[in-house]
Amino acid sequence: MTAPQPNRSEAAPVPSERAGATFQWTVRVYWEDTDAGGIVFYANYLKFFERARTEWLRALGVEQQRLRDEVGGMFVVTSTQVKYHRPARLDDLLLVTARVLEAGRASLTIDQTARLQAPTADGDSPLLCEGHIRIGWVDAASMRPQRIPPAILDALNAPG
């Protein structure tokens, strides 16, 4: 079996930090991510957030495909709230973060941001986009809500 190839738009994830800390993941802006105005198309920030959440869970040992196959459940996005602050442009390196804001029995609310990775002249890493993404755990066959498996909650709460 061939090892999976990384998505060409991603860089290696920064090692995760646990127990409410923030996971950081780097992504480069490619031509396909931009619109006719030369800035990142607004919906692509949701893709960047999704990839960061997936890499964060993977860093915690939570592989979503394996869970679907072996446990029969999966996370689905149930709501998004996004605010855009500044545009990103072609070839920018972005630092995308994920942090648990709230954990319920069947859902998690994740606080996410995208910032320019390279600081500006004043040393700031400008905030480009921020959002709260709610994901729910569902039975993969019926798509009905279920409690998040304890092993996942344990991974989220384990000390670093």
Where are these regions (language model features)?
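HotDog/MaoC-like acyl-thioester-processing domains
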Residues: 2-17, 21-25, 84-93, 101-160
